[in-house]
Amino acid sequence: MKSKSMCTTVGLIAMCLAGSAAAAGKPLYQTGPALSRSAAATATAEPSLQRVLSSPSTANAQVVQIDAGAVAPAEKLLELQLDGQTITATQAKVDALEGGDSIWYGNLGPRAGTRARTLSGVDPLNSAILVRSGDTVTGTIRYAGKLYRLRPLADGRHVLVQVDEQRMPQEHPAEYSLLPKFDMPNDGRVTAAQASSGSPATIRVLVVATNQAVTAYGGNMQSLVQLAVAEANQGYVNSNVGITLQLARYETTSYAETGNFTTDLQRFRVTNDGYMDSIHTSRNTYTADVGVIVLNNSSYCGLASGIGSTAATAFASVYWDCATGYYSFAHEIGHLQSARHDAATDPSTSPFAYGHGYRYGNSWRTIMAYACPSGCPRLNYWSNPNISYNGVPMGNASTADNQRVLVNTKANIAAFR
């Protein structure tokens, strides 16, 4: 409702200004000048910043001075500088992490995309998820559909990166077409006519990052992993899946990557082969249903061990720069639950004819879908004909209902450990 006061007197003007200041968000960061790709070649550039600037998917980048204290439950509004504009992020919720760290979720813009929200209360094209760990902040920001990443550098600074999603690596190596299919027990509680998420399930994930990935990223890898888990959980909420993904354990490995996704994933998965065998002890100790290895391999975004899984095959790999914002971390776990790509890209009907991701023209796509012909943002949603985005159903009952797949396989995968 508009105010009837025009603040015409000096006193009222002062009061209005004070009220505006009180309503303004706390700045999350102060921006510096935009960086050019040529800056990556300078001898003084920090190595992880060099990699950011030389990445094909970097549309632009700038070093920022972060205020990590802004990522706190008490901060209901944050100010972000994006595209030369001051954008307000409105807090949706805050999750506490061990050690006093936190994850801050919010919506961006005036009224924060009210029309676009579904039952989750979050607009996927205008939202932010920020992970605070000490003096560092790692986050994914979407504004007007554009993808931004906020990440710490090894020298203590932070960088804000706008990502060109059309220049991200290919989804999978050619071996994807040869992946085995595993028939998972299907509890059948969700049929095409139902929108139920069934009983809730908790899936625990062990994440192992190679030292090569940690060095190449240069930031706080554990926070990046926590961000990937938070994004996965937001996607489950958005699509009424009824899964909570828990980070059972994060650790690193000195295993030397081969540069081949299939080889590295096999060595991660197989027991007693002389490669990373200790991770299986960790998996049992920390009761992790699923294992994911984070690699420094920019050839592709990731690879799962199969379409569907057993307790012995529930392992996947992901390139660190695809894990968040592009949702490859959740995407690969989706494969382990029998989810497939969009039907145009991946027409196989095994194990479920309805088990594909969804693309809506050139406007958007869901987590399991490949890029639209002319490019489109990937929304943090699983295909689901019972949920709409801006009035458009996010799937169909015959070929694009990943939610139904995940709901009907979640109890099985959650019982692997």
Swiss-Prot record:
The active site is at residue 332. Its EC number is 3.4.24.33. Zn(2+) binds at residues 331, 335, 341. It catalyses: Cleavage of Xaa-|-Asp, Xaa-|-Glu and Xaa-|-cysteic acid bonds. Its cofactor is Zn(2+). It comes from the Bacteria. Binds 1 zinc ion per subunit. The keyword Amino-acid biosynthesis does not apply. The keyword Hydrolase applies. Coiled coil: none annotated. This is Peptidyl-Asp metalloendopeptidase. It comes from Xanthomonas campestris pv. campestris (strain ATCC 33913 / DSM 3586 / NCPPB 528 / LMG 568 / P 25).
